[in-house]
UniProtKB/Swiss-Prot annotation:
Family classification: Belongs to the CTL (choline transporter-like) family.
Protein name, as recorded: CTL-like protein DDB_G0288717
Entry's transmembrane regions: 52-72, 125-145, 151-171, 184-204, 226-246, 290-310, 350-370, 381-401, 442-462, 479-499
Pfam families referenced in this protein's UniProt entry, alphabetically: Choline_transpo
Subcellular location(s) per record: Membrane
Gene Ontology molecular-function annotations: transmembrane transporter activity
Residues with attached carbohydrate: 25, 97, 273, 377, 544
Main location: membrane
Keywords assigned by UniProt, alphabetized: Glycoprotein, Membrane, Transmembrane, Transmembrane helix
Membrane topology: Multi-pass membrane protein
Any single biological process term in GO: transmembrane transport
Record keyword Glycoprotein present: yes
Segments for region (Disordered): 1-44
Length: 548
């Protein structure tokens, strides 16, 4: 995808710097002493299968989902879910024999939807062109991000702020023209958000240089292994296939004859004088509900595991590239780097990834059960308030666990340790080097988000111009789908860059502890910026302690 880069030939650290810092190294610590011609790599344990218990549990859950799917496909009847089907039971108080022709509103929406779908079929070629354009823009975006990092990041920030300000101005003008106060209020809120965004960017201007260097280093590592994009695409396609399988299984399970009551609604109750058949029906519905809960939990675990495999692959690619460079900056890693990382994720690190994803799945399942409880007790305001508070707390816990898992997966990819060991050692590494505050200063997330928005807007504009130039009607569904596809494609690119940036950060800390600030693997510009940032954090800490 990319030609070999000339910027790899630059030396990572000058000999004078190595000579000055080489005397400060001693035999204490993990790396020992290092000479200008010798660079030590972090200690790697022999890779072996870890967290085997969670591997077995995950495979059992997948096997259980397959067994339930077999039962659902055998006994399910999705035609029962179609309105006005002859075998669907009638609901008291509703006339199920009413046709759509007797309802003019329904007839209007159905006919309008049919026309939109027909236009969408006619515009399928334009959708294909927009997807190809989004892929090309994503590849160009990464190349620009590496070659013109500072300019491109500032350009992205300025364009993003300008777009938000323009949107606010349009809402204000539209509200003034139509005399709508609500529209003007929305425009005012958007303009206020724009001002807040400008203040945040000005406050974090010192971190922009650090972000530029981090992104440059990440793009170098990613471009040395373009196969990571192939692996990422395969993971996404596998996830889409899994969603299709799970959705069809769930529909068939929901449509098993006898499950006339919504299994996800706990309102079901029986009369005191119910017959034996009604009791059997209630018991059958309980079984269906429990199977559905199992399928939902399995979906959360499997989807979290797929995401963990993706993060492991990217982290393995970037970390392997980081520690495989020679003193001139060249690396011997190639196309097989990503495939080896995927192989480790599906073999020795399988249990560790299953363990980390299980934590996320359990939290997501608890959040789902809280939503079911909230819907079942919608009339009880006290229960709704308590459940809403629990949902807020659980959401905060989920964000923290996801943040912890991210670094745990990176360390698993680097060393092959178990999940708990990797997470503990990674955060010990961060705390020992006083860099935990640096992560919060990065504005990379904002840049990546604006990049996704710009990519989606460019694809939508391209589709609109193409439809207009070909004399076709501007189908809103076609334009919206092109923007959605572009957002998903850019999300894939930016997700790779985001994980790679976090991996570079952890690799630098490991590099610094191993080589003791002498003859490091990292490029000199990023090393200087990180050292300056570390000194700033230490100065702030000393000032705070002196005030206390």
């Amino acid at each position: 995808m990319w030609a070999p880069e000339e910027d790899y030939k630059q030396p990572l650290l000058t000999n004078s710097r190595v000579a000055n810092n080489g005397n400060n190294n001693n035999s204490n610590g993990r790396g020992g002493s290092s000479s200008p011609s010798t660079r030590l790599q972090p200690e790697h344990s022999s890779r072996k299968c870890n967290d085997i218990l969670f591997t077995i549990l995950f495979l059992l859950v997948i096997g259980g989902m397959a067994a339930i799917s077999g039962i659902a496909y055998t006994k399910g009847d999705p035609s029962r879910l179609v309105p006005n089907a002859p075998n669907i039971p009638s609901i008291p108080g509703f006339n199920t024999n009413t046709t759509s022709s007797e309802n003019p509103i329904e007839q209007y929406f159905v006919s309008h939807l049919e026309s939109l779908v027909a236009e969408l079929k006619r515009d399928k070629d334009i959708l294909i062109y927009s997807v190809l354009l989004a892929i090309a823009l994503g590849a160009a975006w990464i190349q620009l991000l590496k070659s013109f990092t500072r300019f491109f990041i500032y350009f992205t920030l300025c364009v993003g702020v300008a777009l938000v300000a323009t949107l606010g101005g349009l809402f204000m003008a539209l509200g003034h023209k139509e005399g709508s106060e609500s529209t003007m209020i929305v425009g005012g809120c958007i303009i206020i958000c724009t001002l807040v965004l400008v203040v945040v960017i000005v406050y974090l201007r010192k971190s922009i240089d650090l972000t530029c260097a981090m992104f440059t280093e990440t793009c170098r590592g990613v471009q040395r292994s373009p196969s990571v994009f192939v692996i990422a695409s395969l993971v996404v396609l596998f996830f889409i296939g899994f969603i299709a399988y799970w959705t069809s299984s769930f529909i068939y399970l929901f449509s098993i004859p006898g499950s006339t009551v919504n299994p996800l609604n706990d309102h079901t109750s029986s009369e005191a004088n119910s017959t034996d058949s009604e009791q059997e029906q209630s018991a059958f519905n309980t079984k269906i509900r429990n199977l559905m809960y199992f399928m939902i939990f399995g979906f959360f675990w499997a989807s979290s595991f797929i995401s963990a495999v993706f993060q492991h692959c990217v982290a393995g690619v970037v970390s392997n590239w980081y520690f495989s460079r020679d003193p001139t900056g060249k690396s011997l890693v190639g196309q097989e780097n990503a495939y080896r990382s995927l192989g480790r994720a599906l073999s020795t690190s399988f249990g560790s990834l299953a363990f980390g994803s299980l934590l996320i799945a359990f939290i997501e399942f608890m959040a789902f059960m809280l939503r079911v409880c909230k819907n079942s007790n919608a009339t009880n305001k006290l229960v709704v308030m308590v459940v809403s508070c629990l949902q807020c707390i659980l959401g905060c816990i989920e964000s923290i666990v996801r943040w912890i898992n991210k670094f745990g997966y990176i360390y698993v990819a680097m060393h092959g340790h178990s999940f708990c060991t990797s997470t503990k050692e990674c955060f010990d590494l961060i705390s020992r080097n006083m860099f935990n505050a640096v992560i919060m200063d990065f504005i990379g997330g904002l840049v990546l988000l604006l990049g996704k928005i710009l990519g989606s807007a460019a694809s939508a504009l391209f589709t609109t111009a193409l439809l207009y130039g070909m004399g076709k009607s501007l189908n809103p569904i076609t334009i919206a789908l092109s923007a959605i596809f572009a957002f998903c494609i850019f999300n894939l690119f930016t997700h790779i860059v985001g994980i790679g940036t976090d991996t570079i950060f952890v690799c630098y800390l490991e590099d610094l502890e191993t080589n003791k600030d002498g003859n490091l693997y990292i490029s000199p510009d990023l090393h200087e910026l990180l050292q300056d940032k570390c000194n700033e954090c230490k100065e702030k800490e000393q000032k705070n302690q002196s005030k206390v």
